Amino acid sequence: MSENVFLPTENLVMGAKDDSKPMEYCYNFKWGSTGTADGQFLRPHDVSFDSDGYVYISDRDRNDIQKFSANGTFIMKWGSEGNKAGQFSVPYSIEIDSMDNIYVVDRGNDRIQKFDVNGTFIQQWDRPKNVNETDQEFASPEDMVVDRKTGNMYITDTGNERIVKLDSNFSYILEWGSDDGNPSNARGKFNHPHGIDVDSKGYVYVNELENPRIQKFDENGKFIMQWGSEGKGPGQFTPLLEHLEIDSNQDRIFMVDGALNPRIQVFNSDGNFTTSFGTQGNGDGEFSKPEHVNIDSSGNVYVVDRGNQRMQVFSSC
C-alpha cells in the first residue's frame, strides 16, 4: 500500500456533519468465542439475514457458514475447506436476495456460490455466465450486493480493480473501474474495491481497502461524488478501511473503520457524518479489528467483531 494517498478535491465532502438530530446506538448483547465448536469463531467476516430473521455468518478460517437465531442461538452450519461445490477457500461476504437465496463470495476460489437457507448448494459462477473470455473471470472477489428492487447484482471484483454488474440470472450487464487491472486513486477508479451496497434509489456505494474514501455511483456506474480523507476525525478514515452497509429503511450508511481506528461511522446518503460508536477494546461495545456490519429489519446493528471472535448487537437509544 502506498504511503501517500491523493484524493481529487472535486465532488469531495470532507467530514461534513448532518445538522439533523443523529440516531445514537447502544450495546445490546453479544455471542461467540474462539474455537471450532458450533457457535464459535476463528475469523468471522460477514453477517446477513434472511426474511425470517435468521442470521448467517461467514468465517474465513473455519471455511464455513454458521446460521443462528436473531438472539445468537446456533442453528446449523455448512461448508469445509476445498474447491468443490459447497466448499470454501476464504469465504468473504454473504448476500441474501428477496427470495432467500444465499450468495457466498468464495474469494480464495475466485467464484460466487449460491445456496438455499438450509445450506443446500444450488450453483456457482467464476465469471458472468454469458461470457467466455478468460479476462472476464473473477479475481479475488470480496463483496457483492443484490438490488432488491431490480434483482441486479454488483460484485467487487477486487483483483481486477472493477465493479461488475449482473442481472438476476448472473448475466453480464456492464462494469466500471480499471481498464487494465491496475489500481488507481482517480475518481471512478479503485484501489482494492472492498465493500459495496445499494440504497433505496439504486445508487451504488463503494469503499476501498487502500483508499480512505467512499464513492457514490448511479446504477450505470456514473461517478456522482466521493467523501473521506485520512484521519481519525468525524468523516475521516484510517488505512485498511473495511466494509460499508446501508440501512435500507432510511438509507443510512454504516462504515467500519477497521483495525487502526475500530469504530462504526454513520453517514446520510449525501456523505454527511451523523454519528459514530465503538472504540478499541474487548469490553461490551468495544471492538478489535471489526470487519463487517449489517442492520436487521428492526434496525438492530450487528457488528462482526473479528479480533474478539464474537458478534455484537447494538440498538438505537
Residue ranges and their predicted role:
Residues M1-E3:
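Sec-dependent, cleavable N-terminal signal peptides
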Residues F6, A16-C317:
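Eukaryotic scaffold repeat domains enriched in small/polar residues
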